[in-house]
Amino acid sequence: MRGEKEKMLAGEWFDPHDAELTADRDRATRLMHRLNVECCGHGDDYRTTLGELCPNVRGFIREPFHCDYGYNIHMGEGSFVNFDCVFLDLAPIRIGCGTLIGPKVQLLTAHHPVSYTHL
C-alpha cells in the first residue's frame, strides 16, 4: 500500500493531514521564515536556505516566497522569480531555463474533490 506522500506525488487523492506530509510542510514553513526574514535575499546563507527548501531550483527566487513543500519545484539555470510569489507544489512545478516570472504570480497545483461523493 502506498503512503500519502507517494499518492500526492503521483497526483492521486491523498490525506494532507498525514504525519509525514505535515512534517514536510512544517519544515518548509521554517525554511521559508529563514529565507524571507533572516537571509535578506543574498549571500551564502540565502543560497544554502533556498537549496534546503527547494533542492531542484537552479535559478533565483526573490523573497517573500511561499510554497507548500519546496521539493516539488524544479527551476532551470538562469530562471528568475520576482517578489511575493506563491507556488503550491502538491504536484510538480517545472520552470524552464531562463524563464522570468513577475511579482505576485501564483502557481497552484492543489486540487480537491468537487463532489460530496468524493469526501
What feature does the model see in each segment?
Residues 1-58:
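Terminal amphipathic alpha-helical/low-complexity segments used for targeting or macromolecular assembly
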Residues 57, 63, 68-71, 76-77, ...:
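Left-handed beta-helix
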Residues 117-118:
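Conserved small/polar residues in nucleotide/adenosyl-binding loops
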